[in-house]
């Protein structure tokens, strides 16, 4: 019997979590909460508007820990981090809500979104329509669908549920086969290429560059994971990739927003402030 990969372990636990949550709060109750939530802020539109200007469209991630690195940030106050990112020039936020493997929480998404005006994606392992409705009830503006975690029928079902509750969808791929499935199954404009292999957790920026020629121009490519310095940013920009999802590089910095500005908008200079998070 083969040893389960990290992704397989996460998905097995996620199925248990969905069962536990749906036993506590019914889908009908969640749908009522979703209808009462603040109007979506337009996640895809915000990225598209920035990319049209050939300016970095940064999805800045709020992430306390990961399976490969353990705790990444000890001083973890989502509202403060969100404000710092907004000031530093982020276009959108990504908030980890997975509890068991990333030490995330639903409340972190709510706190971050309430602290700023940026659109927010719920970063989690979505496998069930329940989680999609739950995301909207929490106030999310977008959800992540990971092709490696879903078959085509479920992927299409989750995207349809997302559309029904007013959520944008970011579909994430890791290789050519997944890209082909995503393009065939979903019409979302947002295609994320994760440079981290979710089975081994190794990172290679060439993943984005290799897949780029196969992605139609009308889709917006978001490069995810492994962007650590200006050279990485410039490598993507000369290839016409202007949208980035970055977490760890910011989370390890004393001031996440200042690090965002240093990495993506160096011409603005780095803000000077007494606060470690401003």
Curated annotation (Swiss-Prot):
NCBIfam families: PRK00278.1-2 (NF001370), PRK00278.1-6 (NF001373), PRK00278.2-4 (NF001377). The keyword Manganese does not apply. It catalyses: 1-(2-carboxyphenylamino)-1-deoxy-D-ribulose 5-phosphate + H(+) = (1S,2R)-1-C-(indol-3-yl)glycerol 3-phosphate + CO2 + H2O. Keywords: Amino-acid biosynthesis, Aromatic amino acid biosynthesis, Decarboxylase, Lyase, Tryptophan biosynthesis. SUPFAM superfamilies: Ribulose-phoshate binding barrel. PANTHER family: INDOLE-3-GLYCEROL-PHOSPHATE SYNTHASE, TRYPTOPHAN BIOSYNTHESIS PROTEIN. Signal peptide: none annotated. GO terms for molecular function: indole-3-glycerol-phosphate synthase activity; phosphoribosylanthranilate isomerase activity. InterPro entries: Aldolase_TIM, Indole-3-glycerol_P_synth, Indole-3-glycerol_P_synth_dom, Indole-3-GlycerolPSynthase_CS, RibuloseP-bd_barrel. PROSITE patterns: IGPS. It is an enzyme of class 4 (lyase). This is Indole-3-glycerol phosphate synthase. It comes from the Bacteria. It comes from Pseudomonas fluorescens (strain ATCC BAA-477 / NRRL B-23932 / Pf-5). The keyword Transferase does not apply. Its EC number is 4.1.1.48.
